[in-house]
Amino acid sequence: MKIKCGKMVAFMLSVIILFVGVITNLSSIYVNAATSIGALDENDIIYMVLTDRFYDGDATNNGTLGVEYRPGELKYTQGGDWKGLTKKLDYIKNLGVTAIWISPISKNETLSRDGSESGYHGYFTHDYASPDPHFGTKSELINFVREAHKRNLKVILDVVPNHTADYLETAATNYSSNAYQPAAPFNNPDWYHHYGDIKDWNNEFQVLNYDLGGLDDLNTDNADARAELKAVYKNWVTDIGADGVRVDAARSIDKDFLKEFETALGVPSFGEVFIGDVDYVSKFQNYEWGVLDFPLFFQAREVFAHDSSFHNVKNILDQDFKYKNPNHLVTFIDNHDRDRFLCLADDNYQKLRLALTFIFTVRGIPDVYYGTEQECFGGGVPTEWAGIPNKENREMMPGFSENGNIYKYIQRLNQIRSKYSCLRNGTQREMWVEDKLYSYSRRNDLTGQEIITVINNDTQPLTRTIPIRTESSLSIGQKLTNLLNTKDTLNVISGGITGRQISLTIPAKTAYVLTSDTPAAYSEPNRVVTTIRVHYDSGLGNNMYLRGSGYPLTWSSGRKMFNISNDVWIYEIERYDVGEQFEFKPMINDNTWSQGNNYIGTGGQTIDVYPNF
């Protein structure tokens, strides 16, 4: 019996040693694996990056020159990679964001079927399980995540479970070539729908089952496809330590699968539901942690870029009760599928500041598109009217200065949002609304912490008396300070329907973010503003435009001016340096030139002109 026991002990020891060896070998594959520093949540501020367009940290992985790698041709690979992102992490951290959303990481098809663009963006998936070699190796991706985590920056993966690249001919049920198909096991035609492209976006069957722009639509009703999608992305999330995911084309994915998918991955997800209907979008929060707030995006952009009424924003926010948690909505003013904000806003930096202030103080999680802080303008000519913009709005990052006014403005907004938790999880309550002025409160009803935002979107100063909400803890006589310029202060006074109110005169195109704290002194950095004032009564119904040399002015199309009185039109430019000279000429309705020679302007000055037409 003793001998038998000894043999048994020896056998068990050998099994344990073998098992430990196997586990050691398996874990050595991911010896550099990163781990999550915490799940994405409403406390975060997101910075969205197209990896290929950020920074080229390794020229050896750029691909074949003249094929997919074509510097300057924005439908093709430009060279950005994970090494480049890693090198610029301090720049991103210093901006004040807390999470980085990177473009899809899986290996993409080199070129589209017709060769008109490369898979630089990450949405032409070829091999879900392998990293795209243009971005780097898996170990380089893991190193990027680890370095981000060291800086307390979360990483959000962009995932693409809806489709692969366009391998199947329209409505075909088999591949036409063994050489042109996705990597196994996704090269099984039974895993796909075969209906052709979506033609009618009001037809929900088409939205869910047809192809998105020719990209092969995966059938998540197929159990094997469903299981493999969950497994491959679970591996990515686990191996690199991702903290959340953004689900591409979530509108076209079965909702039950979205819920199952998020559960399998084990991290919060937010989906792209590309439509402005709150009733439609809100349903997705029953299946995912969050969702991109396209309804608010469309209306906020109209308000801040095109000067429409604040009632359009109010009408969206009034429907917040339809969402499971409106603080989990991801808010934005532009992205890789829309024109850049400055492109639509006639390059008006102050409009940009107001739009950014809005998404940083309204409910939801703000998302800043890369390059916004560097005043990227997306070519300056709107293109989304012709479809999904995918060139100039995805330009290569122009630089990494931390001294620009917009960079510093976003930095300040990040500081404010990070300090005041009510801006992250507080209840949103409207205080005042009219066409050109909007005011709202964000209040933590447990602690009483409150921030009041007032935005004047008019071209004139506005004087208003605004009632304090009944829910507020603010008392008569309490001092409020503007966190965007602490020299601006006011007091809560008696009166109004709630017995407490604030009275203020707020300058044109200005936002106040008010706290009852006593914050450290802060004023916005000095701005170099070039102001052109055209003195002319253009008549009822007519508008004044400017054409000229030196962006944002061009000779091909005009910039619309603001009418500040019967015969005075104004246009402000912040892109010119002090002393920089340029030419310009006013036009009525952008089709009738003023008489005489071009006017000469100088950066940093106010130029008054009195044209004849």
Protein language model annotation of sequence segments:
Residues 7-29:
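Sec-dependent N-terminal signal peptides of Gram-positive bacterial secreted proteins and lipoproteins
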Residues 33-45, 50-240, 255-281, 302-303:
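Substrate-binding/active-site clefts of carbohydrate-active enzymes
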Residues 45, 493-526:
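C-terminal beta-strand-rich structural cap/linker in extracellular carbohydrate-active enzymes
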Residues 49, 92, 102, 128, ...:
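Conserved, mostly hydrophobic/aromatic
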Residues 54-63, 341-342, 540-542, 553-555:
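Short, solvent-exposed loop/turn elements at domain surfaces
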Residues 163, 231-332, 347-349, 357-361, ...:
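Active-site-proximal helices and loops of the catalytic beta/alpha 8
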Residues 507-511, 604, 612:
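Tight coil/turn sites that cap or link beta-strands
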Residues 533-581, 589-607:
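Aromatic-rich carbohydrate-binding modules that target alpha-glucans
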